[in-house]
A protein has these predicted regions:
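N-terminal ordered "arm"
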Residues: 1-49
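Non-transmembrane, interaction-prone alpha-helical and coil segments associated with secretion
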Residues: 2, 7, 62-70, 74, ...
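Glycine-rich loop/turn
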Residues: 5-23, 113-135
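Acidic, proline/glycine-rich low-complexity IDRs
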Residues: 5-6, 123-170
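Short, flexible beta-strand-to-coil junctions
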Residues: 12-20, 56, 162-165, 170
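Alpha-helix initiation and N-capping motif
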Residues: 36, 119-120, 146
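Structured domain cores in non-transmembrane regions
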Residues: 36-102
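Extracytoplasmic/secretory-pathway segments with low complexity and glycosylation-like composition
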Residues: 88, 92-132, 169-170
Length: 170
């Protein structure tokens, strides 16, 4: 996992041509979110059309034509999630339910998190805390087969079991 402090992109100045004295085109690493004024100052460019993203270290993939404002928006959304269970499991969650990182970001508020480790604990939590079956009389709580309910939940596509807890999305 890439930490927030480590999110960065390598940007090339495409207006300066390759020269034998240089090993490559002039470029530099920039921390994200990126400030275009810093790019302008360090690379000597005037517009975004004069740059190209050559490399990146981000918790999401970039397409060839991703604009800086899009990268900045995604980085800010990742920063907003920092410290949450979803932040630590975003790669697994995204791959489970979404075809792209942008789609994951668009639906992240619809993902529920349960701070338990297995199906039986999740069943107990859903019955007793969330009141999945409505209010159950306390005398009946000990007669519920939480293990069986948990096994059903574990086979559901709507739940994702991770080391950091369980996520639900429908």
């Amino acid at each position: 996992m890439i930490l927030i402090e480590e999110m960065k992109i390598y940007i090339l100045n495409t207006t300066r041509f390759y020269h034998e004295d240089f090993e490559e085109y002039p470029g530099a690493w920039f921390s994200c979110p990126v400030d275009f004024e810093e790019i302008r100052e360090r690379l000597g460019v005037q517009s975004e059309e004069e740059i190209e993203i050559e490399d990146y270290e981000l918790p999401f993939p970039l397409e060839g034509n991703t604009r800086l404002w899009e990268i900045n928006a995604l980085c800010r959304m990742v920063q907003e999630m920092q410290g949450t269970p979803l932040y630590y499991e975003m790669d697994v969650v995204q791959k489970r339910w979404f075809s792209s990182f942008t789609e994951f970001i668009d639906h992240k508020d619809q993902i529920r998190y349960y701070p338990v480790q297995d199906g039986e604990a999740l069943a107990r939590y859903l019955v007793q805390e969330v009141q999945l079956f409505g209010e159950v009389h306390p005398d009946l709580l000990n007669h519920i087969d939480y293990a069986a309910i948990g096994r059903e939940l574990e086979t559901s596509e709507n739940y994702l079991f991770t080391d950091n807890g369980i996520f639900y999305y429908r």
